[in-house]
UniProtKB/Swiss-Prot annotation:
Organism domain of life: Eukaryota
Motif (Nuclear export signal): 629-638
Subunit structure: Interacts with KATNB1. Also interacts with CTNNB1, gamma-tubulin and KIF23.
Coiled-coil positions: 329-647
Entry keywords, A to Z: Cell cycle, Cell division, Coiled coil, Cytoplasm, Cytoskeleton, Microtubule, Mitosis, Phosphoprotein, Wnt signaling pathway
Gene Ontology BP, a term: mitotic cytokinesis
Protein's UniProt name: Leucine zipper putative tumor suppressor 2
Source organism of the structure: Bos taurus (Bovine)
Function: Negative regulator of katanin-mediated microtubule severing and release from the centrosome. Required for central spindle formation and the completion of cytokinesis. May negatively regulate axonal outgrowth by preventing the formation of microtubule bundles that are necessary for transport within the elongating axon. Negative regulator of the Wnt signaling pathway. Represses beta-catenin-mediated transcriptional activation by promoting the nuclear exclusion of beta-catenin.
Cited PANTHER family: ZIPPER PUTATIVE TUMOR SUPPRESSOR 2 HOMOLOG-LIKE PROTEIN-RELATED, ZIPPER PUTATIVE TUMOR SUPPRESSOR 2-RELATED
A single cellular component GO annotation: midbody
Biased composition (Basic and acidic residues): 516-526
Biased composition (Low complexity): 1-25, 187-198, 241-282
Length: 667
């Protein structure tokens, strides 16, 4: 049975590795990790050069081995912050470039590996080394033992070594270049200037010392034991490398510094069944990047991790050859891998011990837990059975109730269908009546509009009649005023006639008195006539002058005086007769004038009475017509209200009884 083990990942850097670069956290060591490159950054293009027996993979974007443009299978590792007091910096982001997928890469294998390794992303899970108890609320990322290892894809080809030693080289073909071109500078011959030749070992040594270790490979086919040493007689990297950049870690060796003591130099993945040195190959990208950014002297990782101050660097020696540099780099990587393998062995032993303890504790707890689970399951089964029986009983009752409800609903449905059929028949029967009613409503609406128009006309006529009535009232007031004036004049005439009657009576009395007096005078005149006739005798006319008068006696004189008195009486009677005739004429004239005035007053009175009667008759006719119009208007309003109530379906109100009141005035 395979055991999954994990390496302890410190949250803070170790004291002895304070100045060393922090490598990404190492994941769980199992056979599920493939040898594909991590998404630290795209790999530079492959440069064709002298083939080597092995290849390197770039982790942070500088070097890549095996497959060039595979999709990443693990999340990108963020760059670590530089520790204060050191001059090491990462330049991984500067050299991260996009590279097109290689035709030799297998995308299907990458997808399968990504699907299998989806649960291994992120930091490694934490195991609880406490015996007897495990966390119950474990997250999805739980370590589980596995007895099988997936078949990992094999690298399609072995790339050349110069393709891992620098960024993308520019040239005519884009894939060929020397080692100096891979380091970023132009290609130069052995006769180049001494300054540029002196800077190359510094850059290479700084690059080799500053880069973190890469990922481990997935097979033992490319082990470090098969790597050639590339040792030549004329190359001495120990003497040519500067002391500040290539410190020696062994007797007589000055290749490259190894990993910092006490802390892992980078993420490593190993299988629980494999511990050979053929598991890992180095990545030179991050280690070479540390020397590209710094041009001055800087402390080595070993000296900075141990707390020692590096001496000032000596003047740069002449540049070594490419084979010597490659030899130094490979020896340094070999030492790094040996230290990593030792650390992996230690962590594997610790993880195996912890996992064995946890497994034994869980084996001891499993019977008790199984018994408790069995009892709990039996109790739950009994409760579930009782609950199910209760639910079955309730469901049976609900079923019977639903059957009763269904039968009742069927009956109601039949009743509703019958009512619906009756409603449809009524609707079909009421259709023609509805049309007739609509036509009647249209006709009545036309009549109503006509009646409204007539009502408006009658209202206008009523207003006109009202104005005429006002004018008639004004005329009536004027006629009454004239009548009062006429009555006053009539009263004055009556008083004048009365006075005239009184005067006439007085005149008639005086006339009667005059008549009586005239009768008396006539009688007296008759007597006097008779006396005068008796006394009148024809006298003897004298022949001469009237000597008789002279000689008459006194008696003759008396007779002659009496005859003179009779003549005066006659004259007075005639005068009185003339006055009587005149008085008679005046009385007749006054009687005629009084009679004419009486006739005129009577005619005026009859005219006023006739005018008042006509005015009263007109007023009564106007009043009756107004009452008739009001009754018609009220009847129309009642009909409209009755129609509205009939449309609304309400009962008609009782008709109101209108009493006509006629008031007549007496003249």
């Amino acid at each position: 049975m395979a055991i999954v083990q994990t390496l302890p990942v410190p949250l803070e850097p170790a004291p002895e590795a304070a100045t060393a670069q922090q490598a990404p956290a190492m994941g769980s060591v199992s056979s599920l990790i493939s040898g594909r490159p991590c998404p630290g950054g795209p790999a530079p293009p492959r440069h064709h050069g002298p083939p080597g027996p092995t290849f390197f993979r770039q982790q942070d974007g500088l070097l890549r081995g095996g497959y060039e443009a595979q999709e990443p299978l693990c999340p990108a590792v963020p760059p670590r912050k530089a520790v204060p007091g050191t001059n090491f910096t990462y330049i991984n982001e500067d050299f991260r470039t996009e590279s097109p997928p290689s035709p030799s890469s297998d995308l299907e294998d990458a997808r399968e590996q990504r699907a299998r390794n989806a649960h291994l992303r992120g930091p490694p899970p934490k195991l609880i080394p406490v015996s007897g108890k495990l966390e119950k609320n474990m997250e999805k990322i739980v370590i589980r033992p596995t007895a099988f290892k997936p078949v990992l894809p094999k690298p399609r080809g072995v790339p050349s070594l110069p393709s891992f030693l620098g960024p993308r080289a520019t040239g005519p073909s884009g894939s060929q270049g020397s080692l100096t071109q891979l380091f970023g500078g132009p290609a130069s011959s052995s006769s180049s200037s001494s300054s540029s030749a002196a800077d190359k070992p510094l850059i290479l040594s700084g690059w080799a010392s500053g880069c973190p270790s890469g990922t481990l490979s997935d097979s033992g086919r490319n082990s470090l034991s098969s790597l050639p040493t590339y040792s030549t007689g004329g190359a001495e990297p120990a003497t040519n490398s500067p002391g500040g950049h290539l410190p020696s870690h062994g007797p007589g060796r000055g290749a490259l510094p190894g990993p910092a003591r006490g802390a892992p130099t980078g993420p490593s993945h190993s299988d629980s069944g494999r511990s050979s040195s053929s598991k890992s190959t180095g990545s030179l990208g991050g280690r070479l990047a540390g020397g590209l950014l710094g041009s001055g002297p800087r402390a080595s990782p070993d000296s900075s991790s141990c707390g020692e101050r590096s001496p000032p660097p000596p003047p740069p020696p002449p540049p070594p050859s490419d084979e010597a540099l490659l030899h130094c780099v490979l020896e340094g990587k070999l030492r790094d891998r040996e230290a990593e393998l030792q650390q992996l062995r230690d962590s594997l032993d610790e993880s195996e011990v912890t996992m064995c303890q946890v497994y034994e504790e869980r084996q001891r707890h499993w019977p008790r837990e199984r018994e408790a689970l069995r009892e709990d399951g039996v109790a739950r089964a009994q409760r579930a059975q009782q609950l199910l029986q209760l639910q079955v009983f309730q469901l049976q009752q609900e079923k019977r109730q639903l059957q009763d409800d269904f039968a009742q609903l069927l009956q109601e449905r039949e009743q509703l269908e019958r009512r619906c059929a009756a409603f449809e028949r009524e609707q079909r029967e009421l259709g023609p009546r509805l049309e007739e009613t609509k036509w009647e409503v249209c006709q009545k609406s036309g009549e109503i509009s006509l009646l409204k128009q007539q009502l408006k006309e009658s209202q206008s006529e009523l207003v006109q009649k009202g104005s005429e009535l006002v004018a008639l009232r004004v005329a009536l007031r004027e006629a009454r005023a004239a009548l009062r004036v006429s009555e006053g004049r009539a009263r004055g005439l009556q008083e004048a006639a009365r006075t005239r009657e009184l005067e006439l009576e007085a005149c008639s009395q005086e006339l009667q008195r005059h008549r009586q007096e005239a009768e008396r005078l006539r009688e007296k005149a008759g007597q006097l006539d008779s006396e005068a006739a008796g006394l009148r005798e024809p006298p003897v006319p004298p022949a001469t002058a009237d000597p008789f008068l002279l000689a008459e006696s006194d008696e003759a004189k008396a007779q002659r005086a009496a005859a003179g008195v009779g003549g005066s009486l006659r004259a007075q009677v005639e005068r009185l007769r003339a006055e009587l005739q005149r008085e008679r004429r005046q009385g007749e004239e006054q009687r005629d004038s009084f009679e004419g005035e009486r006739l005129a007053w009577q005619a005026e009175k009859e005219q006023v009475i006739r005018y008042q009667k006509q005015l009263q008759h007109n007023y009564i006719q106007m009043y009756r017509r107004n009452r008739q119009l009001e009754q018609e208007l009220q009847q129309l309003s009642l009909e409209l209200e009755a129609r509205e109530l009939a449309d609304l379906g309400l009962a008609e109100p009782a008709p109101c009884i209108c009493l006509e009141e006629i008031t007549a005035t007496e003249i």
